[in-house]
Amino acid sequence: MNRKIFGIITFGTFASVAVLCAAPVRAADAKTPYPSMAPLDQYLIADRNAEIALARTAAPLSISRDATVMVLGPHGYETAVAGKNDFVCMVERAWMNPFDSPEFWNPKNRSPICLNPPAARTVLPLTVMRTKLVLAGKSKEEVKESVKAAIEKKELPELEAGAMSYMMSKDAYLTDKGGHNMAHLMFYMPLGTVWGANVVDSSNEVSEPFPGSPLLLAPSYKGNPEPIDMFLMGTGVWSDGTAAPM
């Protein structure tokens, strides 16, 4: 695979700095646009029904209409709709990015996702824990160390075979870069799995050890601290069946 699949979320060109003496400050801001957590209300969606609807756009209706739906509250995720098919749909926030991502605290991030049953059982608990710690006011380093400790103590479930998720929402805002979005599937595998995937770093830059491969190895998890490799594959179609950029 080349950069075409991931090109929609690469950096755009920034305007030149008008005042020369301000350049160092602006450069620093560009590298760390979100240095700390924004006020909580910027991450919440006031209309609960709107968040439920957005969560369901992550997967085709045949999956999402019978899924459990979770929404973000002031203290963490809570179940808004009880499902029938053991899938779970929700809208993730930016703190599910790698800990060194410059967008870790981006309040604009809205990432609808539907997890299949194995992922709901063994990947979702990571999301729930990270979120609870963030909303309790923990720093990035404190969140990371708490998750690491929970893994070492086996307080979190081990990854189950067959875990995957859908991120096919046309209305997602995944990143500030490019088109902000990408319709894709995600496959969760044990750390160190080799699938011949090209590699995405925490700034969404792509290196290509396997040109032509349709797979990307995401920067999330990767032992930092979760012992999971997450592979992405573009779908070329949104959850509503319309064509998506590739």
Give, region by region, the residue ranges found by the protein language model.
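Primary mode marks residue(s) on the alpha4-beta5-alpha5 output face of response regulator receiver
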Residues: D29-M246
